[in-house]
Amino acid sequence: MNKKDIVILCCVALCSLSGVSAQQPLRLSLDECRKMALAHSEELQKSDNALRQAELDREIAKTAFLPKFDASAVGAYILPDMDMMGMELRMRGTYMAGVNLTQPIYTGGKITTGHRLARIGEETATEQLRMTRMDVLVEADNAYWTYIAVGRKVRMLESYHAQMDTLHRQTEAALAAGMATENDLLRIETKRSDISYQLQKVRNGADLCRMSLCRIVGADFDTAIVATDTIFVASQPVGLSAETAARPELHLLEKQIAAGKEQIRMARADMLPTVGLSVGYSYFGNLELKGMTDAGGGTMVPYSQKYRDGMGLAMLSVKIPIFHWGESRKKVRKARYELCNAELDLQKNTRLLNIEVQQAIRNVQDGYELIRTAEKGLRQADENLRVMRNRHAASMASLTDLLDAQSQWQQAESNLIEAQTQYKIYETEYLRATGKL
């Protein structure tokens, strides 16, 4: 084997290894699913950006307490020269530069109110981030447990299909021995075709659930996922709290009321005087004045004088609103109506949140009872199927009875899968409803 062949084989081996590595499934626990969903969620990133913006708004509002420092410079070249009472004012290359400091002294409380509003906005953004985080976790949990449930249904139908394959082989042998009829074999084949149809539908559903989970955790859509938290543990729910004080929605409504009160103060500030202080210094130069002057004895001689100098300025301004056709009072009344609406929203949604948490508690309790009922039904279906298999093998039960027992087992297994999955989803919904997620 020459060197070229060795290089080609090495390249093929490396490509094979990379292909195997790319096909490795993603093993995912519920905790890992949550972490990846939080890290990938665009909505959560947008809420986090909104919080950063609110923090900057608060920092911006702080600067309103501080003096503003500005600098300016102006240059001018004016033609022709200006005539001023027989003299010429020349401004060719005239310049002026200055600095100015402005400090608000009293603004009717607008600056303080604006700072409080900015702080409320920051707190609102924090609660909005919490609410978005909860929504992401609820979506991740639902997708995770649904994916597990559909996978279990696939395995259940595959087991059911294997049972029908075994029964089909047994019936073929019985038909050859004259102990079964063609109708028995046709009924089994029909049932097996129906199971194949159901299995295909569930497999398609499982693939869609996998792609949905890939979207949530930020994985490629062709990534195979192996869920590791497949053991369902359901303990009897006791001591479930109906407290809603930790709900971010409730906090958002409270912040809305607080903001409404500040808006009233802001509207009232328009009726109050404002006081400001301004201090500055300016320097100008290259300003020339030309004219004629009496040199004595009636002799007029030309003269010119250039000016360059600096000057300071201190100014205190007071603005008092006197008459604006009731504009400010109407703004105050409007802000009061908005505050009233915010208080009504709080009353309404507090009742709705209480109903929601009560429903969540009821769902958890009912979900646990459904699991117990489904487990009992599955035990009975298992025993019934075992008995019917033995009786059918001993020719003491008809094929119809055996097929019915298998259908009952399938339904009981499906009921248990759905009950366990729904219970896990109800647990997450309860945590969200109480603000503990």
Describe the residue ranges of each PLM region.
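Bacterial Sec-pathway N-terminal export signals of envelope proteins
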Residues: A22-K68, V74, F221, A227-Q263, ...
